[in-house]
Every structure is written in C-alpha cells, then in structure tokens.
Amino acid sequence: MANKKIDHREEAVELLKQDAKRILQLIKVQMDNLTLPQCPAYEEVLDTQMYGLSREINFATRLGLIEPEEGKKLMSTLEKELSTLHELSMSKK
C-alpha cells in the first residue's frame, strides 16, 4: 500500500459540502419543475433533507472530524442559499 495518508477531516468536510450542494440542487429542481415553496410536499422534502444534513454534521462533529463552528457555518450557508433561491423563485412566478 502506498504511503498515502488519508486526511479524514478534509474528506468529511468535502463530503458534507457535496451533500449541501446536492440538497440545494434538489430544491432548485423541485422549485423549477414540480411544486411551489408553499406546497407541503416541498416543505417536507426540504425539512427532511436539512434534518439529514444536520445529523451528518452532528456525527462528524462528535467524531472530531469537523469543529462545531464549521458545521454551523455550513448549515447557515446552505440556509442562506436556499433563502435566496426561494426569493428568486417567488419573484419569477
């Protein structure tokens, strides 16, 4: 095996960022094609995805892979991006 040291911290942060990006993309597709933001199905998908990401962040924090502040920042950034997306969607309709 090569002498390649795996940096689990960087890997954890990158995976969490990818999941946040996936959630943003999922919600964007849903807003563009399927439902209105006031729709219960939309809200349920958003709540479920955000809850899942928060649990992933909590798990990574408990393992010491990310700092609590980094997890809070990731959630806050995603919430701001989703809010902006929501505002843009509402202004188009």
Swiss-Prot record:
Pfam families: DUF1507 (PF07408). This is UPF0358 protein lmo1070. Belongs to the UPF0358 family. HAMAP family: UPF0358. It comes from the Bacteria.
